[in-house]
Curated annotation (Swiss-Prot):
Protein name from the UniProt record: Translation initiation factor 6
Keywords: Initiation factor, Protein biosynthesis
One BP annotation, GO: cytosolic ribosome assembly
Transmembrane segments: none
InterPro entries per the UniProt record, alphabetical: eIF6
HAMAP family hit by this protein: eIF_6
Disulfide linkage: none
Length: 223
């Protein structure tokens, strides 16, 4: 299912919410009616939480079906909550807190910012149980903001080159394409939320943008 709505009253749904094929993690202050929309669209249960006491969950964590890597400032009660959900939890070493902004991952691979240390890369590799590749994309290090990826496909910044798209295909093991959401927004990772069952994009997204999202994320294969 593909929905066009501003869940958090602005286009940046990927900054506030985290989703995998198993669950969605949403801020405590998100209205129950919005939580229900997420659950219906992504076909998962949603849990209300925070990271480091903050509602920017999508920016401060990255997850797949195998685990979750979070900001080093995560609170003990938050770690306990994730562990009780059956998640393998690890904090990223170093000074970088916005893990979700600098890592894009599915169950096959992850692309991370090149400034992450070897230690941080190893934590991501072990926790998410994936192969990790470090690189910049479209001249930027905010990989997680540039890419929305699931186990069925990926959508990345419209300025990505063919070589970069091919690189992402190799790492993630799925097909994908470039595009925008929200009437021209290139930071598709920040302004969309997706798993293998569905996606939510900014309310302002146009028909052609929706069609590209549907194709890039592999939903046409379900028709």
């Amino acid at each position: 299912m593909l929905r066009r709505i501003n869940i958090v009253d602005n286009p940046n749904i990927g900054v506030f919410i985290l989703a995998t094929d198993d669950l969605a993690v949403v801020p405590y202050n998100l209205l129950d009616e919005k939580v229900k929309l997420i659950e219906e669209t992504l076909e998962v249960d949603a849990v209300k939480s925070s990271i480091s006491g903050c509602n920017l969950i999508g920016s401060l964590a990255v997850a797949n079906s195998n685990g979750i890597v979070v900001s080093p400032h995560v609170l003990d009660r938050e770690v306990k909550q994730f562990e009780e959900l059956g998640l393998n939890v690890a904090t990223i070493p170093g000074n970088y807190t916005a893990v979700g902004n600098i890592v894009a991952a599915n169950d096959t691979g992850a692309i991370v910012s090149p400034f992450l240390s070897d230690e941080a890369v190893k934590v991501i590799e072990d926790t998410l149980d994936v192969n990790v590749e470090s690189t910049s994309m479209v001249g930027s290090d905010i990989i997680g903001s540039l890419i929305t990826v699931t186990n069925k496909g990926f959508l990345m910044d419209k300025n990505a080159t063919e070589t970069e798209v091919d690189f992402a295909r190799d790492v993630f093991g799925v097909e994908g394409d470039i595009g925008t959401v929200g009437r021209g927004i290139s930071l598709v990772g920040a302004c969309s939320l997706a798993n293998s069952s569905g996606a939510i994009v900014a309310k302002e997204s146009t028909g052609p943008e929706m069609a590209r999202v549907e194709e890039a994320l592999g939903f046409l294969d379900d028709l």
